[in-house]
Amino acid sequence: MEYRVNRRTGDRISVLGVGTSGLPAAGAKEGAATLEMALEQGINYFDLATADSACFPIFGAALAGVRKQVLYQVHFGANYAAGKPYSWTTDLEAVKRSVAWQLEQLRTDYIDYGFIHCMDESGDWRRYVDNGVLQYLETLKAQGVVRHIGLSTHTPALAREVLALCGQPNRFRF
């Protein structure tokens, strides 16, 4: 496997990562085998932006014993609950519940890369700030629960706007 070193963090990140949306359809046993095979092939970066909460316990069961070898990317604001369909939220209490649930299901006490999820309009960012979500995430980072905070958007202009609004150019850089 080829790797890139993140110059800001020192993390060695595989050039191939694994997304998770289709994993639960294969079933827990096949899903775990897929993750184990990916790890054996040197893949160490796993993106947990998914429409199905069932992938989280599969990851927890398959990779908890090798947690130090993998990098998890989760998405804050993606709202998961067992057996419920995916939703998106800027509500602080919902984000807190979702983060706690994800940590529990992944059988870990930290998240490597946490993305503020699906920021596509200026109002989305404003709600994150006004609702206290950004402050909560920064508290998690200070506690070591989240190593790095980033932003997920489909709108490049919004990414530039958020970076300008936060007033700290390095705030969201890995």
Question: Whereabouts are the PLM-identified features?
Answer:
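Structural motif corresponding to the early beta-alpha repeats
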Residues: 51, 65-92, 117
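Active-site beta-loop-alpha junctions enriched in small/polar residues
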Residues: 21-23, 49-51, 75-79, 116-119, ...
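N-terminal binding-site loop/beta-alpha segment at the start of enzyme catalytic domains
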Residues: 1-74, 136, 142
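Glycine/proline-rich, positively charged
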Residues: 40, 86-174
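Active-site mouth loops of central-metabolism enzymes
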Residues: 16-30, 79-96, 122-126
